[in-house]
Curated annotation (Swiss-Prot):
It comes from Vibrio vulnificus (strain CMCP6). HAMAP family: DXP_synth. The keyword DNA repair does not apply. Homodimer. GO terms for cellular component: cytosol. It is an enzyme of class 2 (transferase). Catalyzes the acyloin condensation reaction between C atoms 2 and 3 of pyruvate and glyceraldehyde 3-phosphate to yield 1-deoxy-D-xylulose-5-phosphate (DXP). Keywords: Isoprene biosynthesis, Magnesium, Metal-binding, Thiamine biosynthesis, Thiamine pyrophosphate, Transferase. Mg(2+) binds at D152, N181. Binds 1 Mg(2+) ion per subunit. Binds 1 thiamine pyrophosphate per subunit. Belongs to the transketolase family. DXPS subfamily. This is 1-deoxy-D-xylulose-5-phosphate synthase.
Amino acid sequence: MTLDISKYPTLALAETPDELRLLPKETLPTLCDELRTYLLNSVSQSSGHLASGLGTVELTVALHYVYNTPFDQLIWDVGHQAYPHKILTGRREQMPTIRQKGGLHPFPWREESEYDTLSVGHSSTSISAALGMAICAEKEGQNRKVVSVIGDGAITAGMAFEAMNHAGDVHSDMLVILNDNEMSISENVGALNNHLARVLSGNLYTSIREGGKKVLSGVPPIKELVRRTEEHLKGMVVPGTLFEELGFNYIGPIDGHDVVELVKTLKNMRELKGPQFLHIMTKKGKGYEPAEKDPIGYHGVPKFDPAHNSLPKSSGGKPSFSNIFGDFLCDMAAQDPKLMAITPAMREGSGMVRFSKEYPEQYFDVAIAEQHAVTLATGMAIGGYNPIVAIYSTFLQRGYDQLIHDVAIMNLPVMFAIDRAGLVGADGQTHQGAFDLSYMRCIPNMVIMAPSDENECRQMLYTGHKHQGPSAVRYPRGNGMGTPIESEFTALEIGKGRLVRQGEKVAILSFGTFLANALEAAEALNATVADMRFVKPLDEALLRQLANEHDVLITIEENAIAGGAGAGVIEFMMQEKIMKPVLNLGLPDKFIHQGTQEELHEELGLDAKGIEQAIRHYLAK
């Protein structure tokens, strides 16, 4: 449903940044109010990321007002906060389609708009990319400006500091804006800091500063005195020492919701040379009281009525796989005081809220630091404890070297609880868990499990926790199948699958939660179905039996076909000289766009109907 733009008269005048820059500066506060209301009304009808965007309205307006986008390059880290950017860059009328199949991408996306300089989704990439662009802009000599906007969560990642360290060394012209919405980090926001920011970014101060450096460069004691005096002035009111040490000129913190002050400061900073760092303070969920009070709950929202001041409650029903994992942690920790659970900033998403409250001494949130999370688990395993790393499939990619070098080579008992495996839906290409089976299957010592339902997931988590070596249990986003969950723990025999349905001629080997679809297709085909359970090691005895008793084998998995479980089946059969045709069903060799999980399964032929059709087509060849 498209919103009536006539209710937002100032916003109606700013469909693009070129139009925005024609507005008088005194109209910008009104524009921000209308943009914030428009964003709230739009996302409440479409679902999507809300609280982050509400907090960056003034910053977005100020950036596009001051900088000549898209010639000047603006990079949003992660991209949750970029909805106002999309609204102001010609995509206002398409906002109702965001995160939907065929609609606007959930994050800034290069293919979608010339204003989206960098395709994003994972955190902490913006400063590295911005530095690369700044180096090229400097070589081209076109006076192109480059700006990176990064949040206080994303900046904690090592990659961000690696980039800032390098930027301070090469000294290219670029601006990093820290969007800080954690008031505990810096509370001194107000008139003094706004005034100081203007002073520190103004022409008089910068000319004295740069001139003083040149004039006094041959007199080290005096130069040091000037520097220390400047740092003393700034240190009284700003927490910028770290960024200065990395080679940035630090300015702030300033009020990120005062659009006029932002414009003044950005205009000053636009002309500065070398790496600049602007620290702004914002409130996540700004302007909508329920989101201000619960920014985590309103980070990503379903459709809701803003007038009700609350989000719709889930209808209960089948538990999510994330909750299955969270319950397992609590039940297991009651038996095992040496269980240690680690998450890289995904407490809520991974179902660990209850565990973090009931077992705080056994819970470790390492922030956005996947590499550290994995090697922290290594140290805990060496120390005689039983670590579990709870991580999304797409984010484990960031800790791949540590998985090999720090866990698998030493054959340490670290279990990886891999959430969001397979297609996650609305977050699109950057978040689909399409590759974990492929990138783990080639690692020696790994035991890899793929449950078909929620009870199997619980028992596999127990199996992995008890296994004296590296293991992984991968499970999808969303709810289970309604299978009864056994409270008692039962360790599964490593590398053993199970026969679920006996048929003839065709055998379907299911890895993971496509088992229900496979069974439905098998009814129409009178096919045999096996729940393989283990991707590594494969149940070789069951494989031989199925190959001997059937004409065709079909493998199905919610992972890339290339290098996945089905590829492992073919490798084994070729090694054993078992010459039977094999059809691999799974995710194709492309990055898969957004849509609901159901829509994507149907499109890719991985629902029951699609599986049946694919098998019939293969048999007809």
